[in-house]
From Swiss-Prot:
It comes from Allorhizobium ampelinum (strain ATCC BAA-846 / DSM 112012 / S4). InterPro entries: Mur-like_cat_sf, Mur_ligase_C, Mur_ligase_C_dom_sf, Mur_ligase_cen, Mur_ligase_N, MurCDEF_pg_biosynth, UDP-N-AcMur_Ala_ligase_MurC. This is UDP-N-acetylmuramate--L-alanine ligase. Cell wall formation. Pfam families: Mur_ligase, Mur_ligase_C, Mur_ligase_M.
Amino acid sequence: MKMPKSIGLVHFIGIGGIGMSGIAEVLHNLGHRVQGSDQAESANVQRLRAKGIEVFVGHKPENLGDAEVVVVSTAIKKSNPELVAAREKLLPVVRRAEMLAELMRFRNAIAIGGTHGKTTTTSMVAALLEAGQLDPTVINGGIINAYGTNARMGEGEWMVVEADESDGTFLKLPADVAVVTNIDPEHLDHYGNFDAVRAAFRQFVENVPFYGFGVMCLDHPEVQALVGRIEDRKVVTYGENPQADVRFFNVRNEGTKSIFDVEIRRRRTGRVFSFKDLTLPMPGRHNISNACAAIAVANRLDISEEAIRKGLSTFGGVKRRFTLTGTWNGVQVFDDYGHHPVEIKAVLKAARESCKGRIIAVHQPHRFSRLSSLFEDFANCFNDADSILLSPVYAAGEDPIEGIDSEALVSRIRSGGHRDVRYLASPDQLAGIISTIAQPGDFVVLLGAGNITQWAAALPSELQALSGKSE
């Protein structure tokens, strides 16, 4: 049985969250009555209101109104007054992933999983399906620039979703195609150990039906090892690895644009497809790898080479993924969500490949627990930056951990031999420092999952105000 239209008013607690807002939007577009609440005003809240969805600011029992179903994310605590009221009324309480799973039952579904790269890969798969006239429905974990939103309601038979592994609920998603970009030791607070993370991703792939398939990155050692453990399911591999079924090679850079070739081998038939000089309007091998995953999916869905070329060459990217916020005196300022050492390293490497000048990295560590568990990895992920500025940790509600802070990380990076790493005590100091060290041709890359995105947006105008020069 699929979810009926007659389920009544659906109330989302925390509707402004990036995952919740997309589900709410698609439910609304399907004709369901939707409302919600969030702690504060935000761009997502305003976007939902503009679509006719009522959103309350603040959490109060009376916000439920006539709601017959309540949707919550794992970020919502059991003591939340709306959740308490819903349970007192014996209303069904649905987890975010469970509601996403219900939506997926209406379509053939592609779920994008992995520790990093999910949002960009989801966007790329959506772009290729759209270019192939498949008109997909999309629910993403980030704002897709082409849509101005993280959700899209299509009329086609395919749905593309980002599968969040952080709390294990991605195993509830009924995917026909499961993509795994990489597997790193993240979210150990939920899983307990890395072996449990590995087991979850194996189940994620093996959950696809026999007529479905997995798409797995052969460049990542953990994923390559997992490929050998997958039982009784079809797997398509991709990457730069010469053994990959969908392999990219001959990579060239033109500014912030990537050009590359792809060769696709069908194992059963031995048939080979070659795509020469594909263009992606963003730098970095990690982005080419994500594009390769999308190509693997598109090829299996019989999307033409012409459509694949068009979808990649016109790909508009994702908000906060190496997003240019402005230019000052020949210096380009970028905003990026990267907050894990693997992500930071990949972004800075991509910047290095496309920048003619120096790389100035500004990072706001996110969560004391992450900095503590990955301290040495953080100390070694900034090698492609000529200068590093580290701000205080964005706690995200966590308590401090003794000896784990940005000043300690500055000392560790400096002791490892980096020539220019500094502590940024306040964002008020940022423009002044950048104005003295940045030269024409340099990239300033601001990285983090906290409020550093606001600094990135403001920095070009702040630099202009200091110097009176801009472009």
